[in-house]
Structures are given as structure tokens and as C-alpha cells.
Amino acid sequence: MSVDSVYKYIVFDVIRNIKSNIKNDSDTENVDESIIDEIQTMWLDRLTQTGAISNQNDPDETTATTTTTQPQSTLSTVEHENVRNTLNSLIQLNNKSQTTTTTTTSTFGNPQQYLPPQKEVSNGTSPTMNSSNGSNNNNNNNNSNNSSNSSNNNNLPSSLRSIMNPMPQNDGTLDESDNDDDNNNNNNDNDNENNKDNIDKLIIDGFKKNFNFNGDEVIPQNDGLNDDDDLDDEEIGGGGGKVEEDSLGSDLDDDDDDDPDPIIEHFVLCQYEKVSRIKNKRKCNFKDGIMHLNGKDTLFNKANGEMIWN
């Protein structure tokens, strides 16, 4: 029984069961069977598009459609057995493919020390022969792996190949390119030092131009060699002598101590409660004070007074 017949049998069996359930169920009794037939044709068309079955109009289909209208008890047991045998054969083929892949990949690429120990041969051959055979097999495997890796590396870009397969250096640790790099680095260091020396020299020259050796700043004169200030400083005093200047703290800076202090004839020293102003007049309410009037001192608790503010 072919794979096409298995797929078609499954489709027709499902559709037959759906129709039987619709007939037996009161809720779905009014469902039209043409809808179920459309579902069947759509299913078969999808299988045909995917390539699971060869052609929908197969002569086996006509026989299968006739059997779909019949009840399940009228199907032959031989057809069931053929379908079951086909499914079992497919399962066995799948299991065999899985076991073969696992057995081949389990020992692939393992070193010799991880391989299972080999039994001695009963005909008296030495185990060294077996070990040599095993080493030869490992060498063959390694050669095959290297050839496969080299073929894979050829498909990679040149940058990746240079990283994965670096070129060994057989002419010694140092070569001319290394010496050239060292010389270039030394020349760069010397240039940097020369630049620093030139910068320091320029800074020192500028400092000497603007400052004298005592550290005083030299202010450049931009208004000519001779001006009025220079003449005043040099020619005051007749014959160009220096003008005597008064030192700080001399008598000229002191105030005249000979002037007498002003005499105050009348004064009041007290606290005030209120001061009101009317034009240039002041009305004051004093308390708790002392007043000096006409050469007499008088204490008071409260006092009122009027003054004219000039």
C-alpha cells in the first residue's frame, strides 16, 4: 500500500466519522453534507499542493469515496491491516535512521584515550598491532578533519582566514620591519623633546622681554621718548635735582590740634516717646533723662518741648 493511499485513507476516515456524528447528533442534524464534501476537497487539494499525494483524481480515490458512504462495519479488515503495516514500516524506518545517526556521531572525532578498549585477538596477535591500527585510524580521521576544515576555510573571507590560520614566522624573532618601527618610535620621541625645548626657549625669551632680571614688570612706552611727566619728574627743583618729598606720618598729615572744641551750652540726654513735625518745628515728648540748661543739670521723668529746626 503506497503513501498516497495512506493519506487518502486518513482523510476519508475522518470525513466519514464526521458525517456519522452529524447524523447521530440532534444538534447538528440540519448540517448540509455538501459543506463536509467541500472540506474534503480542500484537504485533498492542500495535500496535492504540498506533494504529499500525487493526484487527487486517482482511481484509488473513487474506491475510497464509495467506501465512505458505507458504514464502518462494511470495511474490509485487509485494508486496515495494510494501513497498519505501512504505518509500522514507516515508524521502523524512522527509528533506524535515528539509531544510525546516533551511533555514527557518538564516536566521531573522539581522541584515542576516550575510545572503548579493544579486546585482544585470540590468534595470538600482539595488542601493539591494534594500537597501531587505532593510531592509523585516528590519523586518517584527523587528516580527513583537516581536509574538511581547510575546505571550509577556503570558503571564508581572506581576513577571517588570516586570523584562523596565522602564518608562522621562520626567519627569527626580529626583522627589518621591527627595527624600522623602533627607529621611527625613537625619532618621534626625539622630535617631541626638541619641540618641548623650543617652546621653553620661546617662553623664556618672552619673559625676559617683558620683565627685567629683578622681577619687576617693564611697562612699554608707546607715546614717545619724552613727555611732560618725564620733564616734570626730572626738571623740578631748578638744576634737575630731585624734589624732596614729605615722608608719610609727617606733621603735614596731622590735623590741627590747636583748635579748641566747640562749647555746647545746652543739651538734653534722654529717651523720647513721640516726635511730631510741623514745617520746621518739632514737638517732642521726653522721658527719663537729664538736661543741662544754663549751667545746671536737671533730672526729669517726663518733659515736653518745642524746637525750631533751621
Swiss-Prot record:
Superkingdom assignment: Eukaryota
One GO CC term on file: transcription factor TFIIA complex
Purpose of the protein: TFIIA is a component of the transcription machinery of RNA polymerase II and plays an important role in transcriptional activation. TFIIA in a complex with tbp mediates transcriptional activity.
Protein family according to the UniProt entry: Belongs to the TFIIA subunit 1 family.
InterPro entries: TFIIA_asu/bsu, TFIIA_b-brl
Regions crossing the membrane: none
Entries under Gene3D superfamilies matching the protein: 1.10.287.100, Transcription factor IIA (TFIIA), beta-barrel domain
PANTHER family, per database record: TRANSCRIPTION INITIATION FACTOR IIA SUBUNIT 1
Chain's gene name: gtf2a1
Annotated protein name in UniProt: Transcription initiation factor IIA subunit 1
Source organism of this protein record: Dictyostelium discoideum
Keyword annotations of the record: Nucleus, Transcription, Transcription regulation
Record's compositionally biased regions (Low complexity): 62-77, 122-160
Oligomer status and interactors: TFIIA is a heterodimer of the large subunit 1 and a small subunit gamma.
